[in-house]
Every structure is written in C-alpha cells, then in structure tokens.
Amino acid sequence: MHLGTRLLLSGVALVASTRTFAAVPPPAPYGPVPTARQLQWQEMEFIGFAHFTVDTFTGKEWGYGDESETVFNPTAFDAGQIARVARQAGMKELILTCKHHDGFCLWPSSFTDHSVKNSPWREGHGDVVKEISRACRKEGLKFGIYLSPWDRHSAVYGTPAYITYYRRQLTELLTGYGPISEVWFDGANGGDGFYGGARETRAIDNKTYYDWPNTIALVRRWQPMACIFSDAGPDIRWVGNERGVAGDPCWQTLNRRDFSPGNADSARLNRGDRPGTDWLPAECDVSIRPGWFYHPNEDGAVKTPAQLLDLYFQSVGRGATLLLNIPPDQRGQIHPPDAAALLEFARRREAIFSRDLARRARATASNVRGRARRYRAENVIDGRRDTYWATDDGVTNADLILKFPRPVTFNVARLREFPPLGQRVEGFVLQQWQDGQWKDFAGGASIGHCRLARGADVTTDKVRLRVTQAPVCPAISEIGLFYEKKD
C-alpha cells in the first residue's frame, strides 16, 4: 500500500475511532485536506522531467511547428538508460514531453502525421512514449505525461475542432501506456506559429477555449489516480517560477477559484494562500541546464551537485515537490555530465538523510492530547509518517523537547506535519540548548508536508520545537536531525 493511501486511511481511521476511544478523539481536520492521489504525489518529493522532441535537434526551445519529421532521429536512443539515471538520482517519477508546443508527437498518433511514424528513427516504427513508460516501470518509477495544449503545427488550433483533436490525443496517451501518475498541462498558449502553413498569430481565450472541466473529467475517467498539474490544479499548482524555488512560507493551500491555466499570479502561486479554500501543493520545475531541451553549447553549464542540493532545500525543504528536467541528448540518452551531477547529488542527499540523530533521543512534550499514547511525543522520532504528536484542543502553543543521553552534532533539521489533518502550524521555532540557554536554530511560519533547515554546526544534548502560532492544536509527525559534511 502506498504511504499516501496509508496516511489517508490512518486519518480516516483516527476520525472513525472516536466511537472506540471516545475519551480521546483525534483532532478534527483543519481546512482543506489532501486526497489520496495528492498524498501519493507529495510523498515522492523529487521527480524528473524529460524534454525531448524536434527541438533537441534544431537548437530551439520552442519549435515553430514547421519542423520536418525527418529532423527527429536520435542515433542511440536508450529509454533504459534515461529511466535508470532518473532512478539512481532518487527520482520517483519521470514525466515525458509527449508533445511540446511544436506539435510533434513522440508516439504514432492516429490523428496526425506529424509524429515519430514519419521520422527516420526506427524506420518510422518507433514509439518513444511506449519505450520510456516501459523503462520507467522496469526501474520502479511512476510515469507522467506532458501534452502541450498549444500546438503551433495544427491547422485547426484556435477553433473548436482542435479541442476534439487534443482530447483524442490525450485519450490515446491515457489509455495506451499503462498507469499514468501525473498529467501536465502547460500554461503557455496562443501566439505565432506555422498552423498548417498559415504562418500567423492566433489568440485564444485561455479561460474558456480549452473547456478544462471536460478535459479534466477525461483524465479522471481513464486515470483516476493521476494528479493533474496546471496553474490552477486541480491537484498540483505551478510554483510561479522556473527556477525551482518555492516561497517561504509556501502554504499547501490556495484559493483555486481565482486561477485558471495560463492565468498565473506568480507571487501567490509561489507562496500559496492562508487561509486557502483548496489543498493545492506546489511543484517546482527547473532544468539541470539553462534550457529545457538539450543543446551541445550548454554542456559546460550543467548545474553542479551543490546547486542541485540548494534547490532541494528551497523546494522540498519548503513543502513543495522538486521537478528537475533532465533532457536527453541527440543520441537519446542523458548526457554524461548531467548523469554525473545527478548521481553525486543523490550521494550527497543520502549522506545527509540516511542517519537521523533524533532517533537517539527521548521525547517529552508540554502537552499530550488526553495524555494518550497514540498522541505521545515519541511519535515524532519513531520513523513513521502515519503517527504524530498532538495536543489538546485549545492548546495551540506547545513545546516538544528531545533529550539526548550524550551530546550530538547536527546542522540540518527536518519537520513534518500530519497532512491528512490539514496544514495547522502558522509559526514555529526550533532551538538548541547551549551555554545555559535556548538558542534559535531555525524558525518560520509553514511546516506542512516537509520543512528543512540548514545552519551552522550545533552540538547539544537538548533540542526544542516550539509551536508559537496555530489556529488549532498542532499535529507533528516528525522531527529529524542530520549532519551535512561541508565541502
């Protein structure tokens, strides 16, 4: 059973268990709460993007739509290598650009000739989507699809006929390639393009043209557990930039009614809304290279492992998910410097998070809900995500102390709330006991799914989490302490 499903069932069971444990009921959920598919998506934390199309061979970032199908001809395509590198990097999912703005399809679609079936690759019998999806399953990765709503090749783009065409292609992808875990709807749409030879500029009303409710219903029909990404969700929101950086705070909630795909208030998307009407966690997209597609002249500009680790702390560490683009090269493989950076990035994360120093401690709290074992302080260091420390209703400011039998040295901390009960904490500080007094190590407003903090080396035998602001009693699932060796 997926952790996300287990967390959701745990939350449901806790609420249902009030009949048996009437004296100590669980906290009531606060505000919007995640669905099972959102919980499964959030638990991945780090996923990959593979931008690959004719642009890989033309040097463009946005193809005009007039590119010949013969341009697409990877010399040594290896879906297994791509998926293997993604898995070795620690990614849990890989999203493929099945069709980018240029309109070229990486699968032999029945509804256009502008696809791999008219390319020289595999003598016109290839299917990139099939090979990547199968390689992902072999490597234990989930598979996601990107299908650009904007199509600069299609002669009917901007007319009602295009919506039928788009949904037919979407249905091909949703029904022909096994389980899909994420469907990615880009906000870029409308502008100049080839458009079947018209070579003109076309504008659409991006609030109404795509009829998103019916397209979303199509995804729900064929892939009910797939999370849908766009500026407005309904499951995942854009973080508001392509730098991979979430706001601080980055609330898990947003007033979704204020947004639609292609209509982005970047500042609000970056930070979320508090309070918010919808559970809509952020996804931080960024490329390992300056561009989204592979270009040989960028081989010397691949992000370093240190830069990738910084991005991890600025995305996952603020409650979002990191979506890192790893574009295949003109061979059809992850280029060597990219792969090397990814593997070293994975090694550094493992070196930090494989050893949780907090597990050595004894935990006590200023208040435990009903003095019940199921809400005890020790739950934050038990290594489980389906248990938590909670306080009595009305106790919204509380302390939890970790006491160590001997001093430990740490410089990284990780905090987690219990998402099935909503995002509850609005202010916290993490402190260490030094020189006879409590000193601040980290603090902020949001914790949510995950909060990471880095600081100077600290040696102490006591650490204290203070919840300083919350509208309801807190529910904290984890306090972790780690040590990062500096270069």
Region roles according to the model:
Residues M1-L8:
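Bacterial N-terminal signal peptides that target proteins for export
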Residues E478-D487:
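Short beta-strand-to-coil "C-cap" segments at the C-terminal boundary of structured domains/repeats
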Residues F428-L430:
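Short beta-strand elements bearing conserved aromatic residues within extracellular beta-rich modules
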Residues F418, W433-D435, E484:
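Inter-blade boundary loops/turns of WD-repeat beta-propellers
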Residues S17-T20:
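N-terminal signal peptide c-region/cleavage motif recognized by signal peptidases
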Residues A23-I381, T387-T396, I401-L402, T409, ...:
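Mature catalytic domains of secreted/periplasmic carbohydrate-active enzymes
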Residues S10-A13:
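Sec-dependent N-terminal signal peptides
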Residues A456-T468:
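Noncatalytic modules at the cell exterior or secretory-pathway interfaces
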